[in-house]
Amino acid sequence: MADGQVAELLLRRLEASDGGLDSAELAAELGMEHQAVVGAVKSLQALGEVIEAELRSTKHWELTAEGEEIAREGSHEARVFRSIPPEGLAQSELMRLPSGKVGFSKAMSNKWIRVDKSAADGPRVFRVVDSMEDEVQRRLQLVRGGQAEKLGEKERSELRKRKLLAEVTLKTYWVSKGSAFSTSISKQETELSPEMISSGSWRDRPFKPYNFLAHGVLPDSGHLHPLLKVRSQFRQIFLEMGFTEMPTDNFIESSFWNFDALFQPQQHPARDQHDTFFLRDPAEALQLPMDYVQRVKRTHSQGGYGSQGYKYNWKLDEARKNLLRTHTTSASARALYRLAQKKPFTPVKYFSIDRVFRNETLDATHLAEFHQIEGVVADHGLTLGHLMGVLREFFTKLGITQLRFKPAYNPYTEPSMEVFSYHQGLKKWVEVGNSGVFRPEMLLPMGLPENVSVIAWGLSLERPTMIKYGINNIRELVGHKVNLQMVYDSPLCRLDAEPRPPPTQEAA
């Protein structure tokens, strides 16, 4: 039946009624889909004050597809019970029945059946009772007959847990006569043509009013992944603080820049194959600044610059090994080395946000590839107090004001600190970053002046993104299992920059 015919039927029924009509009841009387009546109601609403329609919501219980089947044929446990003959049935054969697995466990819990494991041909199932009442089928038949109110809350809850029953919200319209009610519908014009204007016929024709609340068609456009949205926000914070972005295009790095230049010994556990991806081809880096390499070698093996070094036989072959960088601190080392070659020294503030790679076991919170955020400040006479001040400013811009600092160890920073923030949701202090002052054994071989200090800190990009978007499994954020609809629906990233009251104890 066309929409116009349904609308005419609705108007005639409404004219004959005293107060109004319910759209669902009208659909049942006319023997048509409720949605067809709803479409007619909306068409009449568009004509102006012909009708008034009030949206109403009612909840009722409906059987699921499995519930309908059980209401007809009986529950799984009842079917299992009926399938067991007096001499019993092999458990393996029973499990092959369509209702075997579910019905067996339910029938056992109801104590309708038992298992005899001493049978010669394997476990055998026997009836315990002569007959049983299929309460599940009886309850579902009550619901199907419109008597769901006879079931208790506990009974309905059990049926819902078994996915046999569902609570459905039905939206209907209560339709009544409007101020301009009429049973005859005149077609409204939607366009004003030149012919109407020239002939003047527009004066006698009804026009459909503009709907200024209607939504237009959304234009197709690209959508940023949540990780990129948070990355953009972090980048903006660094730029607001006067930082310059470092080049980070060296995904493949030599062990020299990734480890040795950072005063990390060649026997350090982090350089093991269990933690690092080494390259097979090209296996070695051929171009290294050899004068700088010699100074690094001397610092490692003999000491210098006020340090005893590590006192071991430093090997160039080990330093040449290519790898996928394990941190962006290698990019910081390259940037500081370039800075040291410029005379005179100029204070700088650098930052980087890019991918790093670790040979780690994959789980809900760890991937072999992730993003590292790093900030570096180089100036004369910087101290631990400067580092704490910069960290407080940085994290305040992220909306994190409750900070604690804990002493830690890093091969290339001394002193070193872990940064903790109080997580309101978890109700505990969680680590949000690592920081420290670069060691002289790292800076002086580069050629930086002795009175220059470099403070640095870093954190991952994935952790704050997961917290921001309520994601518990990192594989829902990155990888081939990512739901593209999540990327489409995710709102803009707006980090909470509203400062909260400071903690009672700021440092520990």
From Swiss-Prot:
<protein>
    <recommendedName>
        <fullName>Phenylalanine--tRNA ligase alpha subunit</fullName>
        <ecNumber>6.1.1.20</ecNumber>
    </recommendedName>
</protein>
<dbReference type="InterPro" id="IPR045864">
    <property type="entry name" value="aa-tRNA-synth_II/BPL/LPL"/>
</dbReference>
<dbReference type="Pfam" id="PF18554">
    <property type="entry name" value="PheRS_DBD2"/>
</dbReference>
<feature type="modified residue" description="N6-acetyllysine">
    <location>
        <position position="311"/>
    </location>
</feature>
<dbReference type="GO" id="GO:0005737">
    <property type="term" value="C:cytoplasm"/>
</dbReference>
<dbReference type="GO" id="GO:0016020">
    <property type="term" value="C:membrane"/>
</dbReference>
<comment type="similarity">
    <text>Belongs to the class-II aminoacyl-tRNA synthetase family. Phe-tRNA synthetase alpha subunit type 2 subfamily.</text>
</comment>
<dbReference type="GO" id="GO:0005829">
    <property type="term" value="C:cytosol"/>
</dbReference>
<keyword id="KW-0030">Aminoacyl-tRNA synthetase</keyword>
<keyword id="KW-0460">Magnesium</keyword>
<keyword id="KW-0225">Disease variant</keyword>
<dbReference type="GO" id="GO:0000287">
    <property type="term" value="F:magnesium ion binding"/>
</dbReference>
<feature type="binding site">
    <location>
        <position position="438"/>
    </location>
    <ligand>
        <name>L-phenylalanine</name>
    </ligand>
</feature>
<feature type="binding site">
    <location>
        <begin position="372"/>
        <end position="374"/>
    </location>
    <ligand>
        <name>L-phenylalanine</name>
    </ligand>
</feature>
<dbReference type="InterPro" id="IPR002319">
    <property type="entry name" value="Phenylalanyl-tRNA_Synthase"/>
</dbReference>
<dbReference type="GO" id="GO:0006432">
    <property type="term" value="P:phenylalanyl-tRNA aminoacylation"/>
</dbReference>
<keyword id="KW-0479">Metal-binding</keyword>
<dbReference type="InterPro" id="IPR040724">
    <property type="entry name" value="PheRS_DBD1"/>
</dbReference>
<dbReference type="GO" id="GO:0051290">
    <property type="term" value="P:protein heterotetramerization"/>
</dbReference>
<dbReference type="Pfam" id="PF18553">
    <property type="entry name" value="PheRS_DBD3"/>
</dbReference>
<dbReference type="InterPro" id="IPR040725">
    <property type="entry name" value="PheRS_DBD3"/>
</dbReference>
<feature type="modified residue" description="N-acetylalanine">
    <location>
        <position position="2"/>
    </location>
</feature>
<dbReference type="GO" id="GO:0005524">
    <property type="term" value="F:ATP binding"/>
</dbReference>
<dbReference type="Pfam" id="PF18552">
    <property type="entry name" value="PheRS_DBD1"/>
</dbReference>
<keyword id="KW-0648">Protein biosynthesis</keyword>
<dbReference type="GO" id="GO:0000049">
    <property type="term" value="F:tRNA binding"/>
</dbReference>
<dbReference type="GO" id="GO:0004826">
    <property type="term" value="F:phenylalanine-tRNA ligase activity"/>
</dbReference>
<dbReference type="InterPro" id="IPR036390">
    <property type="entry name" value="WH_DNA-bd_sf"/>
</dbReference>
<keyword id="KW-0067">ATP-binding</keyword>
<comment type="subunit">
    <text>Heterotetramer; dimer of two heterodimers formed by FARSA and FARSB.</text>
</comment>
<dbReference type="GO" id="GO:0003723">
    <property type="term" value="F:RNA binding"/>
</dbReference>
<keyword id="KW-0436">Ligase</keyword>
<dbReference type="InterPro" id="IPR040586">
    <property type="entry name" value="PheRS_DBD2"/>
</dbReference>
<feature type="modified residue" description="Phosphoserine">
    <location>
        <position position="301"/>
    </location>
</feature>
<dbReference type="GO" id="GO:0009328">
    <property type="term" value="C:phenylalanine-tRNA ligase complex"/>
</dbReference>
<dbReference type="InterPro" id="IPR004529">
    <property type="entry name" value="Phe-tRNA-synth_IIc_asu"/>
</dbReference>
<dbReference type="InterPro" id="IPR006195">
    <property type="entry name" value="aa-tRNA-synth_II"/>
</dbReference>
<keyword id="KW-0007">Acetylation</keyword>
<keyword id="KW-0597">Phosphoprotein</keyword>
<dbReference type="Pfam" id="PF01409">
    <property type="entry name" value="tRNA-synt_2d"/>
</dbReference>
<feature type="modified residue" description="Phosphothreonine">
    <location>
        <position position="190"/>
    </location>
</feature>
<keyword id="KW-0547">Nucleotide-binding</keyword>
